[in-house]
């Protein structure tokens, strides 16, 4: 092991550490970070070399953060990334600094938004917040209005998690939806992601995603937002139901098929008497 450590350069050590951090299960970033810190045994190298991994993890996981002085949480996503560690809260029209290691927001300041699309963004956000409140008790959503390739675009992000470390499991739901404001109809594109980790007496992970495409009728802001939510609700319900049904099918068929109903001898074993069987055999061989 010592020889292997001597062969690894600092760059290689940081690269390996960064991979561990980026792939940390939801709710277990601190545990993975602390383990990697012990393995690397060089805090300065870890903080400087793996800083990009801390940021990538929060962006990928849609990490929610509370900003002091504001009621609602905002998601840390690539769509709100303003560079240099600053992020946008489109609802409150502020930008703030975010510490990717401590997961803390500081220095909130007023920030400009795309006024041309703000009425559309607000309508979608209002409808989406009502949907999230109904379907995700711990859910957080953030809606962005941006110009992408000259087109006015709405991007809606949802995050909901359950962290149950005492019960040895953690899980997170993420979904991202996009559509452009175009006359008559537009295309809605979404991606749904589920990640769950169960680690009592084992290590089992569920990592699943599904891509969605649908058409949306564009009229006024409020009606378009309502139609958009119908698409979101139908797709997310269908996805969650399908996963539940697949797990039930696996439990009823696949896992049962892996178990042998009877041992090779075709005779059931009385486990309460197994010890006496062993003692008797040893006595016969004596």
Swiss-Prot record:
Modification type N-acetylalanine: residues: 2
GO molecular function, one term: actin filament binding
Top-rank lineage group of the source organism: Eukaryota
Residues bearing the modification Phosphoserine: 9
Sorted UniProt keywords: Acetylation, Actin capping, Actin-binding, Phosphoprotein
One biological process term in Gene Ontology: actin cytoskeleton organization
Signal peptide boundaries: none
InterPro entries: CapZ_alpha, CapZ_alpha/beta, CapZ_alpha/beta_2, CapZ_alpha_1, F-actin_cap_asu_CS
SUPFAM superfamilies from the UniProt entry: Subunits of heterodimeric actin filament capping protein Capz (SSF90096)
Pfam families: F-actin_cap_A (PF01267)
Keyword hit for rRNA processing: no
One Gene Ontology cellular component annotation held by this UniProt entry: F-actin capping protein complex
Role this protein plays: F-actin-capping proteins bind in a Ca(2+)-independent manner to the fast growing ends of actin filaments (barbed end) thereby blocking the exchange of subunits at these ends. Unlike other capping proteins (such as gelsolin and severin), these proteins do not sever actin filaments.
Quaternary context: Component of the F-actin capping complex, composed of a heterodimer of an alpha and a beta subunit. Component of the WASH complex, composed of F-actin-capping protein subunit alpha (CAPZA1, CAPZA2 or CAPZA3), F-actin-capping protein subunit beta (CAPZB), WASHC1, WASHC2, WASHC3, WASHC4 and WASHC5. Interacts with RCSD1/CAPZIP.
Family statement drawn from the similarity comment of this UniProt entry: Belongs to the F-actin-capping protein alpha subunit family.
PANTHER family assigned to the protein according to its UniProt record, in alphabetical order: F-ACTIN-CAPPING PROTEIN SUBUNIT ALPHA, F-ACTIN-CAPPING PROTEIN SUBUNIT ALPHA-2
Official protein name in the record: F-actin-capping protein subunit alpha-2
């Amino acid at each position: 092991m010592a020889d292997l450590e001597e062969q690894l350069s600092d760059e290689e050590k940081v690269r390996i550490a960064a991979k561990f951090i980026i792939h940390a299960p939801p709710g277990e970033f601190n545990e993975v970070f602390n383990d990697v810190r012990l393995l690397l045994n060089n805090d300065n190298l870890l903080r400087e070399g793996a800083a990009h991994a801390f940021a990538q993890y929060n962006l990928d996981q849609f990490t929610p953060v509370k900003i002091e002085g504001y009621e609602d949480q905002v998601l840390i996503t690539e769509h709100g990334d303003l560079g240099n560690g600053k992020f946008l809260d489109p609802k409150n029209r502020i930008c703030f600094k975010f510490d990717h290691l401590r997961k803390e927001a500081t220095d909130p300041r007023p920030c400009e938004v795309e006024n041309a699309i703000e009425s559309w963004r607000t309508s979608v956000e209002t409808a989406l917040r009502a949907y999230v409140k109904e379907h995700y008790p711990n859910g957080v959503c953030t809606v962005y209005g941006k110009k992408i390739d000259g087109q006015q675009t709405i991007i809606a992000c949802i995050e909901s998690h359950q962290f149950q470390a005492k019960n040895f499991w953690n899980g997170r739901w993420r979904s991202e939806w996009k559509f452009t404001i175009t006359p008559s109809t537009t295309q809605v594109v979404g991606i749904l992601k589920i990640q769950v980790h169960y680690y009592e007496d084992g290590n089992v992970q569920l990592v699943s995603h599904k891509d969605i495409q649908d058409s949306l009728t564009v009229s006024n802001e409020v009606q378009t937002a309502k139609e958009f939510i119908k698409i979101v609700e139908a797709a997310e319900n269908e996805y969650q139901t399908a996963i539940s049904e697949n797990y039930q099918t696996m439990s009823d068929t696949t896992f049962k098929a892996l178990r042998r109903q009877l041992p090779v001898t075709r005779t059931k074993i009385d486990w309460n008497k197994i010890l006496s069987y062993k003692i008797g055999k040893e006595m016969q061989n004596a």
